[in-house]
Amino acid sequence: MGIISLNKASRLYWLGRYTERVYTGLKKVKPIYDAGVDGQEGDYAAYCRCLGIPGHYTDTVDFCKRYFFDRNDPNSLASSLAYAYDNAVVLRDTLTTDTLSYIQLAANAMEKAAQGDSPAVALQWVLDDILAFRGACEETIFEEETRSMIKLG
């Protein structure tokens, strides 16, 4: 059993927390997004209440656009992915460059989704890249404590 510094433990925890937030957020908001694509109103207000985030959106389309892609909103998935990337860069020596690259790929896919009119495919790439990141953590991080801190997040 090794010793992990408080700073490193914090970064590992938040890396796991932010990647989980993006993954779970995309999965849970999919029915709301689908409703918006179909021209219906999804129950985004209930989702916001459950997470304790401000429900200051005008409609389902506005919610999806801003919740997914507004990097100026600390509650958005794009912000969470940026925070995950920031932590991953600092932890490059622990994670390995190959593992870090999956977070970069997810960030690139999120950016591509934000720029397109039909973001569903690129958002699926974000999910795929986060799952690949998790798998890479299992395969390349040999210290159980380090892997556990990421999973704890």
Task: Annotate each predicted stretch with a short phrase.
Residues 1-153:
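Alpha-helical transmembrane segments and their helix-helix packing motifs
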